[in-house]
Amino acid sequence: MSATGNKVFAPAIFFIAAREALEASLVIGILSGMLENLVVHTKSAEDLAAHDSLTESEKHEVEQKKRALVRKLRKIVLLGALTGLLIAFAIGAAFLAVFYTQVNDLYGKAEELWEGIFNLVAVLLITPMSLAILRAGNSKRKWKRKLENAFSHQNIQPNHRRDEEGEATVVNANHSDDSASASSSSARQAAEEEAGTKTTRTEKLNPLEAVDVVPSMSGDQRRKRGGLRGLFSKPSGAVNDLKLRMNRGTLALFTIPLITTLREGLEGVVFIGGVSLGLPATSIPLPAIVGLAVGLGIGFLIFRSGNLVSVRIFLVFSTCFLLLIASGMASRSVYYLQFYAYVQLVGDSAAESGDGPGSYNSQGYIWHFNCCNPEANKGGTGWGILNSLVGWNNTATYGSVFMYIGYWFAVAGYLWYQIWSEGRLALRFGGKTYWESNRSIQARQRKQEKAHQRQLREADQEEHGHSSNSDKQQHPSEAGPSTLSH
């Protein structure tokens, strides 16, 4: 039985894998939601006008094509995420294979020393990781803001190339852009008929015309195109215009989840590698796989239910559990370093002498039980689990106990400092505030000021909108229809 975890399931690895999977699933979920909004719910004024003139069957056909496009774009997102995950898995497997094949001999020569060092390294990795989990609830807003910035400049933009090219052949070049945009719909239809490029009503609302992910090229050029088009093309006889091409929009849909899952995967490899330094190799795969499944499942539930309350409960529970594990590791690290110094004095036989006299240093200990030994080959399984979870040991030294208490004081002090620095240190109960710090008062005032300024901007925009509409009614556009070339 290992001192830092049993031989099958290491709890620390489970929570680390779950946290990284949750972060990656949030990105994938946000991207999927953005695709739904960009393709299905976003309509221009022209699209809305044309939508009213469609029959029910035509509207249904348009919606079906939009849904098909969203499904194809989601395949690109999943492909990028899986690619990044596979790369991270390959790097992690190579790292663990090298460690467990090359370092075992060095580890066996000074087991107690390495146990103390590995536990200390694990504490330094788990503690910031567990505290970061408390902020995972804000990851949805953070990644939504990042992805909106990524798509803010012509990633998936309205595209009416064929309409514009059709008009370009019939609109006189001497007319300005203003007069061209002010041309009447009847003149536009006449121009399309003359050029032979008239579009149907459903084509105006075709999502593939409204989203810049469809190739605008000849049949020979489409056959020469490679990339992702072949991966997601439907067989002959299906909707041919659902073939995608790799432009800025589709490239972002592929690279953002790839980079995100690769980064989260490599981060998980670093943390899991550090925590597992003192663990047997058999205790790593199962908690890592289960943690990934739990993290992805929680990310899925966030976007299906929209309720973050249960997720916050899980995050707080995970943080408390990881801190409990880390506190036990901190205590064990001091104990193993002290025990290594004792072994150097009396010889290696002290480590194999069982629970009685000679198995521990008779000076500097607080308690010792001749039972309940987590290292015992027989009857120590239950105590070994407690050793993995809370750091139980049948021998307690002053150093190990003081380290355990000091660890919790340090964590509590850090959390109190963070609450104070963020302006959230206040005493509230039953909806009433009985006391709050000066920083909390300043933060509340800044928030109220921002809300007031936002209301003023919205009122100003609404007023400008009403004034512009009234101006249009009083002064209709004087631009006449576009002059057609003969």
Swiss-Prot record:
The membrane-topology field of this record reads:
Multi-pass membrane protein
Basic and acidic residues bias: where? 446-466
Keywords noted in UniProt: Cell membrane, Glycoprotein, Ion transport, Iron, Iron transport, Membrane, Transmembrane, Transmembrane helix, Transport, Virulence
**One Pfam family this sequence matches:** FTR1
The disruption phenotype is:
Strongly reduces virulence.
Glycosylation (residues)? 174, 393, 438
Q: What induces it?
A: Expression regulated by iron through the urbs1 transcription factor. During pathogenic development, expression is confined to the phase of hyphal proliferation inside the plant.
Report the GO terms under cellular component.
high-affinity iron permease complex; plasma membrane
Membrane spanning segments where?
A: 76-96, 113-133, 252-272, 283-303, 308-328, 400-420
- Chief location: membrane
Task: List GO BP terms, alphabetically.
Answer: iron ion transmembrane transport
Where are the stretches annotated Disordered? 175-209, 441-486
The superkingdom of the source organism is Eukaryota
Q: Which GO terms describe its molecular function?
A: ferrous iron transmembrane transporter activity
Compositional bias annotation for Low complexity? 179-189
Question: Which locations, inside or outside the cell, does it occupy?
Answer: Cell membrane
InterPro entries assigned: FTR1/Fip1/EfeU
Q: What family, per the record?
A: Belongs to the oxidase-dependent Fe transporter (OFeT) (TC 9.A.10.1) family.
Q: What does this protein do?
A: Permease for high affinity iron uptake.
Protein name (Swiss-Prot/TrEMBL): High-affinity iron permease fer2
Give the organism, scientific name: Mycosarcoma maydis (Corn smut fungus)
Instruction: Specify the taxonomic lineage.
Output: Eukaryota, Fungi, Dikarya, Basidiomycota, Ustilaginomycotina
